[in-house]
Design a protein with these regions (language model features):
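N-terminal, motif-rich segments that launch catalysis or mediate targeting to/interaction with membranes
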Residues: 21-132, 139-229
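Bacterial Sec-dependent N-terminal signal peptides
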Residues: 1-24
Length: 229
């Protein structure tokens, strides 16, 4: 299971949608899952099929959002994001006792690596990991607590009122008018060299990549600004 866990830690980095209030939105998360599915090795496919009872990665990619309204799973809500000031670092900033996106991903990986974990636990944490890796590459999930990751920044998207988080979450993706399978089919194929480069990264590396994109957004976006592409 270690190789399977590590696969999910790098494959999401270069997906189409890694440039979401629910994360990437349903279409974005499904597209991410569909793209990841293309790069599965035979062994990984076999292991995932066992855990997901034949369902695809895209099929379960929104699981972590779907359980948000269930009080039984409220403790996992803080795992969808991580916030700290731009002038600080993740390592130096005080950590929330409730956890964050980095804690969530690491926890999921540890469960998948644990040979003593039950299938039920592995299935749950695999579904969560699939979703969280999508969140990790949505810049506003590595944002500012003061405005709730851009949810409180009002902007206009093609002259219609919305907020910055929603634009990145779903508006831009929905504007293409494509299904998640069409988005995945039009994604550039990764070369072996690109995959090797991605594998060298860490969760923290990828988090800071998204953080830089988030910084750029805050430097260029003004409240009530009209956005388009």
């Amino acid at each position: 299971m270690k190789k399977l866990s590590m696969f999910f830690l790098f494959i999401f980095l270069n997906s189409y949608v890694s440039y979401s209030s629910d994360d990437w939105g349903k279409t974005g998360h499904r597209a991410t899952g569909e793209i990841a599915q293309k790069y599965l090795s035979r062994k990984a496919k076999k292991e995932i099929n066992k855990l997901l009872d034949g369902h695809s990665i895209a099929y379960v990619s929104n699981f972590a959002d779907e359980i948000k309204s269930d009080k039984k799973y409220r403790e996992y809500n803080p795992w969808h994001y991580v916030n700290f000031p731009f002038e600080s670092t993740y390592e130096k900033h005080p950590k929330s006792k409730k956890g964050d996106l980095i804690v969530g991903i690491n926890t999921c990986v540890e469960v998948l690596k644990n040979q003593s974990a039950s299938k039920e636990d592995k299935v749950f944490h695999l579904k969560m990991l699939i979703h969280f890796m999508g969140d990790l590459h949505q810049p506003l999930h590595i944002g500012m607590a003061e405005d709730r990751g851009g949810n409180d920044i009002e902007v206009k998207w093609f002259n219609k009122g919305t907020n910055l988080h929603t634009v990145w979450d779903s508006k831009m993706i929905d504007t293409f008018g494509m299904t998640y399978t069409e988005i995945a089919a039009n994604e550039k194929e990764l070369t072996k060299e690109e995959l090797k480069t991605i594998q060298k990264g860490t969760i923290i590396d990828w988090m800071y990549d998204s953080r830089e994109l988030c910084k750029n957004l805050y430097e260029t976006i003004e409240p009530e600004k009209k956005l388009r592409y």
